[in-house]
């Protein structure tokens, strides 16, 4: 990744800042570069699940997929067992007719990050009112770990902190 070592606190192409703190984009790139991954995309009549194996070994995986509302209710759950050859991909379709304004498709399997069909068009979704609460706050070296819990899907949480910008005198 070029420009990974920017020293200025700005939004750019970098994924790691001057202090070696991972920016938000780091985690998206980490998932994109994973050697085994699940991808799920909404399509006509349901969703298309893609299983990618970029390793030299074949594997068998139980893929769990379906629809979940933003309140956590699930529908149309399915499990499909796939044997995936080395350096290959497989796709399969799941037929689900649910409202994508109130939920999303998901796919998960052991050894994979969970994939979902959520996209960045948040204004198109109807999210329930969040009851997010801070559950625990603990110091870990120079880091402050904050655990937040909610009973419904909460896409955004804003934490007010003291000014942590770097000042050059």
Region roles according to the model:
Residues 1-156, 164-168:
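Carbohydrate-binding surfaces of carbohydrate-active enzymes
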